[in-house]
Amino acid sequence: MKDLLNLLKNQGQIEEFDAIRIGLASPEMIRSWSFGEVKKPETINYRTFKPERDGLFCAKIFGPVKDYECLCGKYKRLKHRGVICEKCGVEVALAKVRRERMAHIELASPVAHIWFLKSLPSRIGLLMDMTLRDIERVLYFESYVVIDPGMTTLEKGQLLNDEQYFEALEEFGDDFDARMGAEAVRELLHAIDLDHEIGRLREEIPQTNSETKIKKLSKRLKLMEAFKDSGNLPEWMVLTVLPVLPPDLRPLVPLDGGRFATSDLNDLYRRVINRNNRLKRLLDLSAPDIIVRNEKRMLQEAVDALLDNGRRGRAITGSNKRPLKSLADMIKGKQGRFRQNLLGKRVDYSGRSVITVGPTLRLHQCGLPKKMALELFKPFIFGKLEMRGLATTIKAAKKMVERELPEVWDVLAEVIREHPVLLNRAPTLHRLGIQAFEPVLIEGKAIQLHPLVCAAYNADFDGDQMAVHVPLTLEAQLEARALMMSTNNILSPANGEPIIVPSQDVVLGLYYMTREAVNAKGEGRVFADLQEVDRVFRAGEASLHARVKVRINETVKEKDGSITKNTRIVDTTVGRALLFQIVPAGLSYDVVNQPMKKKAISKLINQCYRTVGLKDTVIFADQLMYTGFAYSTISGVSIGVNDFVIPEEKARIIDAATEEVKEIESQYASGLVTQGEKYNKVIDLWSKANDEVSKAMMANLSKEPVVDREGKTVEQESFNSMYMMADSGARGSAAQIRQLAGMRGLMAKPDGSIIETPITANFREGLSVLQYFISTHGARKGLADTALKTANSGYLTRRLVDVAQDLVVTEIDCGTEQGLLMTPHIEGGDVVEPLGERVLGRVIAKDVFKPGTEDVIVPAGTLIDEKWVEFIELNSVDEVVVRSPITCETRYGICAKCYGRDLARGHQVNIGEAVGVIAAQSIGEPGTQLTMRTFHIGGAASRTSAADSVQVKNGGAIRLHNLKHVERVDGNLVAVSRSGELAVADEFGRERERYKLPYGAVISVKEGDKVDAGAIVAKWDPHTHPIVTEMKGIVTFVGMEEGITIKRQTDELTGLTNIEVLDPKDRPAAGKDIRPAIKMVDANGKELLLPGTDVPAQYFLPANALVGVADGAQIAVGDVIARIPQETSKTRDITGGLPRVADLFEARRPKEASILAEISGTISFGKETKGKRRLVITPTDGSDPYEELIPKWRHLNVFEGEQVNRGEVISDGPSDPHDILRLLGVSALAKYIVNEIQDVYRLQGVKINDKHIETILRQMLRKVEVTESGDSSFIKGDQMELTQVLGENERLAEEDKFVAKYTRVLLGITKASLSTESFISAASFQETTRVLTEAAVTGKRDYLRGLKENVVVGRLIPAGTGLAYHSERKRKRDADKPVRVSASEVEAALTEALNSSGN
């Protein structure tokens, strides 16, 4: 019988739907939803607690309070289902209908919907072409509006105040109609003829010239068309009927003590009903106009507060002075319907507890307390007990479990066997924050966690808690085992490197056992095999660190997969031989024949995974951990104050530095250097001193003298505990040791500038009070940052996930030939990331040729794996075009070829992989490790001293790239361009290093010269910016008058005079507009022209420039005629860390961005205007010159007559990504953003694969701006989805019409998320009101393509295993669609069939 009841309960059929449409509800629609009208503001009877009839909780309208029982109790039980009681009018039904039945209120006067009025831009205002202010004056009964002017001089839509209205009445009588309030607005909206207006606007737009007017008109046109297409009527934005929410969604809950807790909505509804009823009465009584007007205004305000409290005027507050929660507040924000209930729900079958270490567990296990397991698996246990016949009913089983009988434990063990559970640690920043384990029952109350997965969870055991979830269905268990098991997640999805890597104790143990010592016990012995080593070590006859020879048998898996076995004798140590016992067959002995530092261990696991596969790697990782723990225990490494050895040289270095600082101070006192230069020099000095101290300290710590077997004293690597911990990578770093045993160094103020006086003491010596005080500055800032950082990082991740959530791999190959050009990433001359690392796991887009030949060595379409990388590097290829998510041409989603390798699995990515979310998590997860600014060593400032020369690291041939230069008399070259670079190539022509050469650098080598390592090939002054002449001649000064535009300074020490150009602000009135310049003339005083142009050679001097030549002096090519001092350098990169990443992803235009050349051509300067210079670029092809006004204070990098290319920097500053996209194109933008973001992460030592950043970039480049509409329906200036425009263009091209032209637009991630096609996704992200208003007006359809939308409607997501479900549904849908064929097609098919049969 019970099952029968359940059957009846589950009768609600789930409707199949493919899209969700949102629109405006017409009054008829609202009435059709309703089950009756709410006429009274009463809720429930305070004595009987029964709902009042016709009130807000009326049972007649909304349904019975108890299941199958009418209100008066006449009809009870199931047999009367569907009967309507004649006494109380209640239908006998389930009580849950009170959650779905709506009611309505008939408003006595129309009311404008506040969302369409106040949500910017105001839709009502835009449609009626009136300002918001004017409409509000009409709505809130301050002015009349003319609805029908009749034959009078008034105009439709004109506002009249009371006086004007009465004057008009006297003048025109009843010839015109003017009203006030929402009914007037409704009449006006009703009167709009959409088709007529659209036609008028389409004609008007091409005839207007002003940009702003066109913008306004096209906005109106868009809105009108939206109304027309969606079938919404404009007058529906004014409500005449108000729907009432079902009562169970705004409940009245009895508290103990006879009081009631109520939802705020009830108060808001009561207010509306009260005012509405009062208004009805007043209208029946035909009360005076002014009273009715006031009541109507109050009704409008009451409805406003119900829909969106606080949107207009002061929010209505409840009894406790806090604003009431309106309908809009219910859906928006973190606590709103979307984020609280639809996207994140609490789940059954879960528990949480503190975690502790489980060093004895295997990698796929976790320890689950028996108490928790019993509770979590209860239903399974009940079922098993009943099945076994140990309990007759569920009730009996329950009793058994409560008593914890012995049988129960046996059953529990059986239930748990092979039933994985999910462990999750909040915050879940990436997908490895939830993994599956097989539970092992343990005593105690804490969950035991395997130490190797701590890195993935970012867990430690200082009181962290974790949650356990039980996958119930077979499918869930299958997915947990196959996809989420910790053993299947060895590689990190962010960079493809192992994440199951030993750390801390384990590393220390492995490092300790693989170190070698001089003259240790047993040195020089030879062993027959590993077993013998083991026996001798256990017998205590040989030390762990003794150097010995061992015969080993190794099985090596070659690159091509073949297996070779060989036996050889190796020089090694006892510990390494012992470690080799656990290394899986297939790896050579060389992998352990080195001190196992953290990097080496990580590399070993990686190599193991690539060579012998997953299963062996997992076993090996476990063995490594057990071994590491064992030997770190044996080592007994500890830390004591005597481990911090302070170098003797420290005092000398510090004294020397102090002396030099005094010297600089005295120079400053006598005015030889400026404040800024002094600051720079002092800080450079101390940075150098600090480095020297730490060098001396590390040299001191890392070596120790020992006596070898011959009795000689030799140096060996130190066994100092602190040094071993840092060297192995177990804990601590050189920087931290420096603070313990060297000197703490320079500290930063909270604003990021560096304090000039360093802390010369270290922690062992102890700090003085002043030093401690300076330290607290940086340290406190560090703590404040950490708190901010977590929130900011979480928000960044949320925005990233939101912008990329619907990016899923949907096909294998999109067939594009586009790609990005990859080159090695070079910074400061070093190759930071070689080409091999950048192309690993990507697909080649264009054939790769052997350098200098036509031979294809890598064909297009190859997925580059480790073997290919070696091959590419062998052939010294230095650039490769690879496919990229940015250039992928798949319409919805992305193709596997453009994405390349799935980093966490090591093969080509599967269809259905949610690459967008993975990218977002990979970028967001390390966010908390990024600083809020750039430095981070207990507040100690890290600042490199400014580079002033290029010293090559490798010998080889010099190559000069893109370098414009002049040759000086002494044969040296002087750079006169900014983008010049110098590279060094080895004998194979491979580029080993590359350096940027600044303007004015003196280069002592020529193209093709051979240099040795360590040679200094270029020099420049880092603190000033020179102006270099490109010709020889005689200097003449123009506009340089002493005391007016320049001042002379004489150097007391050298007696030389310098001329300094005054800032226009400091000049007397006479000199404000004079532009001091240096002109070049020949011996006859005729002015010289710049070579190759007809521009006179003159150099305008900016403010503060120092001129080093005298008037009339003879100068040669390449001489410096003036220097511009550079400003104080703050700590490198003002915005560092997280804010920088956020700025890049939000595509914010930086303040004082660099100015780029809009076209290629010759530079000249036009007439100046107030405070601005006019820069003119004349193109070489003779088209129109381009002019731009640039503020005078901007320092220009170009001189009159210089040639520039489109996109070259004219004035330095941070780059603006929008400019890069506009002038240089998508690939330049991709390169810029990827490199900038990688720089921030690299500084923190975080590795992220480029493709993740490219994936997010793809989403930022989704939109295009239409520049010419052609024959399409787009309007010029529209922002459209790229896919939409491409689709339309294909259609137009087929019909031989003109296609629309467009430019790509870069949107920041927040903006990109909000402009997605899915309104459900956008509304659940941010600005819910705005998104829903816009979607409703345009009658948007959400086709549920993304992940978020499907989560909201409660479906499987279209990614991973859910993709099959969705493709199946799509297949069914397509099969059901009728196919339309034209008559001609049928005819053609018939003739073809006839012909073929005839043959």
From Swiss-Prot:
The keyword Transport does not apply. It catalyses: RNA(n) + a ribonucleoside 5'-triphosphate = RNA(n+1) + diphosphate. GO terms for biological process: DNA-templated transcription. Keywords: DNA-directed RNA polymerase, Magnesium, Metal-binding, Nucleotidyltransferase, Transcription, Transferase, Zinc. Zn(2+) 1 binds at C70, C72, C85, C88. InterPro entries: DNA-dir_RpoC_beta_prime, DNA-dir_RpoC_beta_prime_bact, RNA_pol_asu, RNA_pol_N, RNA_pol_Rpb1_1, RNA_pol_Rpb1_3, RNA_pol_Rpb1_3_sf, RNA_pol_Rpb1_4. GO terms for molecular function: DNA binding; DNA-directed RNA polymerase activity; magnesium ion binding; zinc ion binding. Binds 1 Mg(2+) ion per subunit. CDD domains: RNAP_beta'_C, RNAP_beta'_N. Zn(2+) 2 binds at C814, C888, C895, C898. Its EC number is 2.7.7.6. The keyword Cell membrane does not apply. It comes from the Bacteria. The RNAP catalytic core consists of 2 alpha, 1 beta, 1 beta' and 1 omega subunit. When a sigma factor is associated with the core the holoenzyme is formed, which can initiate transcription. NCBIfam families: rpoC_TIGR. Belongs to the RNA polymerase beta' chain family. DNA-dependent RNA polymerase catalyzes the transcription of DNA into RNA using the four ribonucleoside triphosphates as substrates. This is DNA-directed RNA polymerase subunit beta'.
